[in-house]
A protein has these predicted regions:
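Long, low-complexity segments enriched in small/aliphatic residues
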Residues: 584-585, 590, 739-834
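Non-catalytic alpha/beta scaffold blocks inside enzyme catalytic domains
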Residues: 376-568, 575-755, 818-858
Length: 858
């Protein structure tokens, strides 16, 4: 997937038709068969006939403004635009005639007469569609001369830190406006003025930074000239080659082309064929990659014996040997279980797999954990119990077939913006939205979208709200009885029906506790049960909670009761927070589970790993991270290997975490920056950014995508190599020569990954969704199609238990946290990019009445 020369991706001009009916026509003497609804422009492109175009793009609806794609059709008058003309059976189309040549040259003359001819010094020289089309139509001179004064008096808008807007280069094709509207769904751009005075305007003729623009880059991607251009391209020039890889921010898992000049990244371009993002991106993935070469990067291994001593730079060999000797010393003194490890949801599947293997096989303990257990293990437990698998059920594409969406405890506009854009498109097409969230998130009321219901649930009462919705569905006869009878356990269902039908679970009875008006809750429940395909998407507002697992079960109950599982447009879908939260769970980063969610106490399962790894494994679950902290404070836990995780900043009760770290005798940090946790470390191993990684990430839709090395590890060693080196120094051999060999081992030991390999992923177009095995050799886009993984679905009783964390006289307010579009997690990466132009510090939002009571004015 390495391109030696950067080429513009093929564009068919208009979107593909989804029709199954085929239409035959003739274009320039060539017989062509395409789906009904296909444009003539696209049909020609499929046949290898490239009709000139400027306003058309296959990720935008046909517009027909540039007048370059005109064709001649037998039996029709005039010269219709091929982008807006659908094919018809028997149609005979001519794309090359003397009259068409004359018209196209005339159109191009008009464009060029009002365009600066500074091509040699233009940043888009060699990557400009206007330049290309001038050559295609054979334009050699301009009869009107060159005035070119239009817009030249307008200043370049360089307010955005990542791209510049030069109105003098604009041909008013409207592609940027349409991309903002159709692809992103922000509606931040418009055409201002008329005729020669027309120009693109951001907001109310504001600078881009002062407008509603979210800097997703869709307009830059759509622009056929240098009107909208990345500043890195302006500074560095055109790229020479590119590498396809996967973004390392949120759980969407966008595919990108890293366009390079030598060993430097020029720009990150969303890959059109990326199955998770379909050529779209957000401000983080598109632009916020500069942290990888930030001056704060730590590129040398370091050690120190005490945390109050200065760091000493050493060789990789000395750092590894020192870390290994400390692990051996501590285990000899305090026992095997005095050490443990933490995997990262930011690292690849292969790296994560090796860390848990290191802990189990080389350390000899099950003391391994991950942040993903805190944020999403309720999903694993809740879904495994009810429907049999620990992951979401659908693809992101599935949302385009939904009719009703429940969005609970999630704010995808900020946390999963590329998915949010696709959701917005479906909502603009007519799907209904129910938001269950304490906050009035952007999707409640955004451009051309208004939620049918916003249920402002009181923090901590999620389970009560969902059980009340189930009460409405059960007592009003809205259950899909046939589906339940065929797919679910009868006894468990009847117990659930009786439970939710009790009067104490009615919306009226729960309103005082949940804060949700009973009428709204009833309306939302009826809409979900009767509105057609119903899908549920949820986030950390559901799972990071004392009743997280119970709430996930309640979500699954609703889906089963209404028959909304096992087909397109429905499902239960957790929106994973980090790029490899799903993968870190899949890879066995839990103290009680081996890769594939199989319990360490299962003798048969453990035996498989023991035979493959050549070592005896502990049958008892190890310590979770909070237990490690407690044990460290009490004196029995003494060493920690922490890869790609800043636990001081990200884990709760910072003072307790710091006390635990101070009590340990050896902390090994593997990271790209000297973070807060590193203040307590004794060994620092330079980590690799995603641009230096080779392996796979697994996103929120179970999609395993390739991550490819864009540049060599700046610290001299890849993360997986460092883990292997430490294991070898401890006496347990890890002798892999490439991450593909690690994936082969994962596939050998994990049933849901049995058919996965790097070559398989490449053959599938860059990604594959697990389960991928003999039963599903090409992966599984939709889960539970014919039956649930566990056989019959199991309804669970979801008793509401009030949270212990309530407002008191001493603590009168409740704090709920949320994502910010421009920043990511604790900000280690994004704070080292120009994203600080939007948010350089955290802000606390407080109700005006609460602020007034406390004398807070701003």
């Amino acid at each position: 997937m390495l391109e030696t020369i950067v080429k513009r991706e093929r564009d068919f001009g208009t979107p593909a038709s989804t029709s199954t009916e085929m239409i035959s026509l003739t274009i320039d003497g060539t017989s062509v068969e395409v789906p009904a609804g296909t444009s003539v422009l696209r049909a020609a492109a499929i046949a290898g006939i490239n009709i000139p175009k400027l306003c058309a793009s296959d990720n935008l609806e046909a517009f027909g403004s540039c007048r370059l794609c005109l064709v001649q059709i037998d039996g029709r008058r005039g010269y219709p635009a091929s982008c807006t003309t659908p094919v018809e059976a028997g149609m005979v189309v001519h794309t090359e005639t003397s009259k068409l040549h004359e018209i196209r040259r005339g159109v191009m003359e008009l464009y060029i007469s009002d365009h600066p001819l500074d091509c040699l010094t233009c940043p888009s020289n060699g990557d400009c569609e206007l330049q290309d089309m001038a050559g295609v139509v054979g334009l050699r001179n301009v009869r009107y001369g060159y005035e070119g004064q239009n817009h030249l008096q307008d200043e370049v808008d360089a307010s955005n830190p990542y791209f510049a807007y030069d109105p003098s280069k604009c041909i008013v094709c409207s592609r940027c406006v349409r991309a903002c509207n159709e692809v992103q769904g922000t509606f931040a751009l418009t055409i201002d003025g008329k005729g020669f005075a027309s120009r693109i305007a951001a907001g109310q003729n504001e600078d881009f930074m002062d407008s509603d623009c979210v800097s997703c880059g869709a307009c830059v991607q759509a622009c056929p000239t240098s009107t909208l251009t990345e500043k890195t391209v302006i500074d560095m020039g055109q790229a020479e080659h590119s590498v396809i890889t996967t973004c390392a921010y949120c759980g969407v898992g966008c595919a990108f082309k890293a366009e390079m000049k030598g060993d430097q990244v020029v720009r990150m371009v969303p890959w059109k064929d990326g199955q998770a993002n379909r050529g779209h991106s957000c401000v983080k993935g598109r632009f916020a990659w500069g942290y990888a070469t930030h001056k704060d990067r730590m590129l040398k291994p370091m050690i120190r014996k005490r945390i109050d001593e200065p760091w000493r730079e050493v060789s990789w060999d000395e750092a590894i040997q020192y870390a290994a000797s400390e692990i051996r010393r501590i285990q000899a003194k305090y026992g095997k279980d005095s050490v443990g490890g933490i995997t990262s949801s930011r690292c690849t599947n292969e790296e994560t797999y090796l860390v848990q293997k290191l802990v189990r096989a080389a350390f000899g303990t099950n003391n391994v954990d991950t942040c993903a257990r805190v944020c999403h293990s309720p999903t694993g437990y809740g879904l495994k119990t009810t429907i049999g698998e620990s992951a979401g059920t659908q693809t992101f594409d599935s949302v385009m077939f939904t009719d009703v969406v429940i969005l609970m405890g999630a704010n995808p506009s900020a946390a999963h913006p590329v998915f949010a854009s696709r959701l917005k498109r479906r909502l603009r097409e007519g799907a209904k939205l129910i938001v269950i969230d304490p906050r009035r998130i952007e999707l409640v009321d955004s451009p051309h979208i208004k939620a049918s219901y916003h249920l402002p649930v009181r923090p901590g009462t999620n389970t009560a709200v969902l059980t009340a919705m189930a009460h409405v569905i059960a007592t009003e006869g809205l259950i899909d009885e046939a589906y339940v009878a065929e797919r679910c356990e009868t006894e468990a269902f009847e117990q659930w029906r009786e439970f939710v039908s009790r009067p104490e679970h009615s919306p009226e009875a729960t309103e005082a506790e949940t804060g949700v008006p009973a009428a709204d809750l009833r309306g939302a429940a009826r809409l979900y049960a009767t509105g057609g395909n119903g899908s549920i998407y949820y986030g950390l507002g559901v799972t990071e909670h004392s009743q997280g697992s119970t709430t996930v079960m309640a979500i699954a109950n609703l889906a089963m009761a209404t028959g909304n599982l096992g087909k397109e447009g429905v499902g239960v879908n957790p929106l994973r927070g980090q790029n490899n939260v799903q993968g870190s769970c899949d890879m066995g980063s839990f103290p009680h589970e081996l890769p594939g969610y199989r319990h360490v106490s299962d003798d048969k399962v453990r035996g498989e790993f023991e035979r493959d790894w050549g070592v005896k494994l502990q049958p008892e679950p190890g310590l979770r991270l909070p237990n490690m902290f407690d044990a460290a404070v009490s004196g029995s836990f003494k060493a920690l290997y922490c890869q790609g995780e800043d636990i001081v900043q990200s884990d709760p009760n910072t003072q307790h975490v710091a006390a635990a770290l101070r009590a340990m005798e050896c902390i090994i940090i593997q990271d790209i920056f000297l973070n807060e946790t590193a203040k307590y470390a004794h060994v620092f191993l330079p980590g690799s950014s995603f641009l230096e990684k080779d392996g796979t990430f697994t996103n929120a839709e179970r999609r395993i995508s390739r991550v490819r090395t864009v540049m060599k590890p700046l610290g001299g060693m890849a993360d997986w190599e460092a883990t292997c080196a430490l294991s070898n120094a401890l006496g347990y051999p890890m002798n892999y020569s490439h991450p593909s060999e690690i994936m082969d081992e994962i596939a050998r030991l994990t049933p849901t990954f049995a058919g996965v390999s790097f070559s398989k992923i490449d053959a599938m177009g860059g990604s594959v969704q697990w389960p991928c095995n003999a039963e599903a050799p090409d992966g599984t886009p939709i889960m539970h199609v014919d039956q649930f993984v566990r056989g019959k679905g199991r309804f669970m009783l979801t008793k509401y238990v009030p949270s212990d964390e309530r407002s008191t006289r001493k603590f009168p307010l409740l704090l709920t946290t949320g994502r910010i579009l421009s920043q990511y997690n604790v900000g280690a990466q994004t704070r080292r990019t120009d994203n600080v132009h939007w948010h350089a510090e955290d802000r606390l939002e407080i109700h005006p009445h609460d602020a007034e009571d406390r004398g807070i004015r701003q």
